């Protein structure tokens, strides 16, 4: 009987201790995070990009209208006077730049800069769940809240970043911050995500990018308006865009 007492004590202690929470489904975590950034498959997002010098002095501002659609497709229309009429089209891993007065789309890379440290891939508002495979690093404390730390590996070579370290709020899976790495595994940028509300966030209103390679300048990508709207399929064809520059 005396030999059974330690066993009974161990069983009783294990019953009283809190059970470890099951690890979350990383696929669901990533899909939830995307919903704060791109809530619908077909959206029009009005975007303002501001750059700041390393001392915090405002530098430049640009305006963009971004059309997102199914099949990893985005069309970026440049609205500022210095870029008026220029367009960037993304279809899958292919990116094209269309200039006013030309009928030949130019291929570019998703990492090519549009303004400051905002690249074509950043402005195009890509979905992490479509382009990356996620693994759970663990639960951590970040931004004064409990977070899930994910490691995202690119599924293809055509994305802006080959690896992303992403931190999501533990309860709502709200994106909080990210480290963005190039194919060489160099840390290119650090991103911080600003929601529309601290208490009850429904969407990301701003992404703040800080360069980690050279000038340490700051670029703020602010989403000023979102609207669910489908556009003609021809808008996602580079040759059709070249023939119809006014999108009439």
Language model features: what each stretch is:
Residues 53-55, 101, 183-184, 213:
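Solvent-exposed strand-loop boundary residues in beta-sheet-rich modules
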Residues 22-42, 48-49, 57, 82-84, ...:
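Flexible, processing/modification-adjacent segments and terminal tails
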Residues 1-2:
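N-terminal secretory signal peptides that target proteins for export/translocation
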Residues 44-75, 79-81:
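N-terminal, post-signal-peptide region of Sec/Tat-exported proteins
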Residues 18-20:
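Signal peptide processing junction and immediate N-terminal pro/mature segment
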Residues 33, 64-68, 191-198:
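Extended lipid/amphipathic-ligand handling interfaces
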Residues 6-16:
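Bacterial N-terminal signal peptides
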Residues 108, 145-238:
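Gly/Pro-enriched, hydrophobic low-complexity segments
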């Amino acid at each position: 009987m005396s030999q059974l007492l330690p066993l009974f004590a161990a069983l009783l202690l294990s019953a009283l201790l809190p059970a470890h929470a099951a690890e979350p489904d990383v696929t669901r975590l990533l899909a939830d995070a995307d919903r704060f950034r791109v809530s619908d498959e077909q959206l029009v997002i009005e975007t303002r990009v501001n750059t700041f010098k390393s001392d915090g002095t405002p530098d430049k501002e640009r305006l963009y209208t971004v059309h997102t659609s199914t099949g990893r497709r985005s069309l970026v229309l440049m609205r500022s006077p210095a870029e008026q009429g220029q367009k960037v089209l993304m279809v899958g891993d292919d990116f094209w730049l269309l200039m006013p007065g030309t009928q030949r789309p130019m291929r570019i890379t998703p990492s090519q800069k549009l303004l400051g440290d905002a690249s074509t891939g950043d402005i195009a508002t890509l979905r992490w769940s479509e382009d990356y495979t996620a693994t759970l690093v663990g639960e951590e404390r970040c931004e004064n809240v409990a977070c899930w730390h994910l490691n995202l590996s690119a599924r293809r070579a055509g994305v802006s970043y080959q690896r992303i370290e992403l931190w999501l709020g533990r309860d709502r899976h709200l994106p909080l911050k990210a480290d963005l790495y190039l194919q060489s595994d160099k840390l290119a940028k650090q991103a911080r995500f600003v929601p529309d509300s601290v208490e009850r966030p429904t969407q990301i209103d701003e992404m703040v990018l800080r360069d980690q390679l050279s000038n340490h300048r700051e670029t703020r990508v602010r989403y000023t308006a979102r609207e669910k709207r489908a556009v003609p399929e021809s808008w996602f064809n580079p040759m059709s865009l070249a023939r119809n520059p006014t999108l009439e």
